[in-house]
Amino acid sequence: MFPVKVKVEKSEMEMAKARNQLDAVLQCLLEKSHMDRERLDEEAGKTPLDTHNKDCSIAATGKRPSARFPHQRRKKRREMDDGLAEGGPQRSNTYVIKLFDRSVDLAQFSENTPLYPICRAWMRNSPTVRERERSPGSPLPPLPEDGEGSEVINSKNRDVYKLPPPTAPGPLGDACRSRIPSPLQPETEGTPDDEPSEPEPSPSTLIYRNMQRWKRIRQRWKEASHRNQLRYSESMKILREMYDRQ
């Protein structure tokens, strides 16, 4: 007698169990995201000394605080905020995001804030430190200048606020001429009228004849570009020193 294969369908109870497991996993992920957000907010509101003391206490006991009930921590945090509101000025709202292991508080910026201050705060990686606000109409502070107005030198480092201008290219009106070489005169060979003219050369022959001329023209452009770059040698020297100090 041959064995008979019997197809067993999943019961409603197994499907309900699978759904409950999926709901539990999604709930854990949701609570984990809330916990991560709250931990980031707490780290943003603490000083580096508090964070160091907390890490030392965890390392000494070998236990970490329980995170099974995030709603209790939210309630405690709400009570602390209410206490701050009653006892002193309330802390301003924060919106801290973490991008590539660096955090920045976006609540301190408005919609019209340029991108550069936001990037500068992100590079600083200190969400608790706020950028100094400056009204759009207020003028920029004057730059410290010396006799030439190009740089300031103190005892520790060298702060450069303005690069020196390039050297003069020559007589007045020769600025463009310093970048563009003088044209190379064509080489013409006159033939007597009584001699018969040569037949028209092929394209390969013309390319071969003009190859040397093209090489000379390209070399003249390279020399003119090099001479023009020498006018900025002082600026390049300052930039090189700034790069080497990093």
UniProtKB/Swiss-Prot annotation:
The keyword Ubl conjugation applies. The modification N-acetylmethionine is found at M1. GO terms for biological process: G0 to G1 transition; gene expression. GO terms for cellular component: transcription repressor complex. The modification Phosphothreonine is found at T167. It comes from the Eukaryota. There is a cross-link at K5, K7 (Glycyl lysine isopeptide (Lys-Gly) (interchain with G-Cter in SUMO2)). Residues 39-55 have a biased composition (Basic and acidic residues). InterPro entries: LIN37 (IPR028226). Keywords: Acetylation, Isopeptide bond, Phosphoprotein, Ubl conjugation. Residues 39-90, 129-208 are annotated as: Disordered. The modification Phosphoserine is found at S135, S138, S182, S202. GO terms for molecular function: protein-containing complex binding. Pfam families: LIN37. Component of the DREAM complex (also named LINC complex) at least composed of E2F4, E2F5, LIN9, LIN37, LIN52, LIN54, MYBL1, MYBL2, RBL1, RBL2, RBBP4, TFDP1 and TFDP2. The complex exists in quiescent cells where it represses cell cycle-dependent genes. It dissociates in S phase when LIN9, LIN37, LIN52 and LIN54 form a subcomplex that binds to MYBL2. This is Protein lin-37 homolog. It comes from Mus musculus. The gene is Lin37.
